[in-house]
UniProtKB/Swiss-Prot annotation:
This is Ribosomal RNA small subunit methyltransferase A. The gene is rsmA. It is an enzyme of class 2 (transferase). Keywords: Cytoplasm, Methyltransferase, RNA-binding, rRNA processing, S-adenosyl-L-methionine, Transferase. It comes from Streptococcus pyogenes serotype M18 (strain MGAS8232). S-adenosyl-L-methionine binds at N27, L29, G54, E75, D100, N125. PANTHER family: DIMETHYLADENOSINE TRANSFERASE, DIMETHYLADENOSINE TRANSFERASE-RELATED. Its EC number is 2.1.1.182. It catalyses: adenosine(1518)/adenosine(1519) in 16S rRNA + 4 S-adenosyl-L-methionine = N(6)-dimethyladenosine(1518)/N(6)-dimethyladenosine(1519) in 16S rRNA + 4 S-adenosyl-L-homocysteine + 4 H(+). PROSITE patterns: RRNA_A_DIMETH, SAM_RNA_A_N6_MT. The lineage of its organism: Bacteria, Bacillati, Bacillota, Bacilli, Lactobacillales. InterPro entries: KsgA/Erm, rRNA_Ade_diMease-like_C, rRNA_Ade_Mease_Trfase_CS, rRNA_Ade_methylase_Trfase_N, rRNA_adenine_dimethylase, SAM-dependent_MTases_sf.
Amino acid sequence: MRIADYSVTKAVLDRHGFTFKKSFGQNFLTDTNILQKIVDTAEIDQNVNVIEIGPGIGALTEFLAENAAEVMAFEIDDRLVPILADTLRDFDNVQVVNQDILKADLQTQIKQFKNPDLPIKVVANLPYYITTPILMHLIESKIPFQEFVVMMQREVADRISAEPNTKAYGSLSIAVQYYMTAKVAFIVPRTVFVPAPNVDSAILKMVRRDQPLIEVKDEDFFFRVSRLSFVHRRKTLWNNLTSHFGKSEDIKTKLEKGLALADIKPSIRGEALSIQDFGKLADALKEVGL
């Protein structure tokens, strides 16, 4: 019997008198086939260390621990720590860290792996309410995570992996794909969770690029330009740029020069621009003094 088997999950929760907290976005997976599929998608073996976020009662952790060199699981809910000590008692390659992943000193933590030189993969069922902040925090950290295989709300997975000229494409697609390739591996129906969430989930596989997708003069400015270009999706690029930078004649002249330099039409919408286009635009706007 597995932790994820519904009868086992229910018995564990009843034994420990556990009640779900909405504030932590807790939904526990009760489908062993899906858990095996997650591990297979992540290609976990004895030559990989894994960081898990939000292990819950250890359903995914159990599968990870059977396959990985070591698992470090970050759990914010104090009440789950003794439960994890119970459900994972047979494993000597799991460390449970009772901490918010956004506040953890990851550089120090990863040194606690017995073999810290092994590649690190992030495999997790992320809480819906904080998916994007966690992902961006990890991606932008200086830690060379090789790969992410994470479950999230289907809509967010679609946005992250979206291509230009699609409804889902936006600044989040650009922010992630600048650093990583991103592809939806498979869909997880809401019916396999306790309690069931209101929407379906998706497993997103992201692999870190050897270097960012494009080279830009100023990364912060590049991300700023991409974000502001989607503030009002139905507005043209020109309208979004002037809303942000201003509408004085001097600013307008600089914007016109920058757009001409990047060979981008002012009447286009942000969703039509590729990451490469945004790179050219940001560099051109920087060059004209914005």
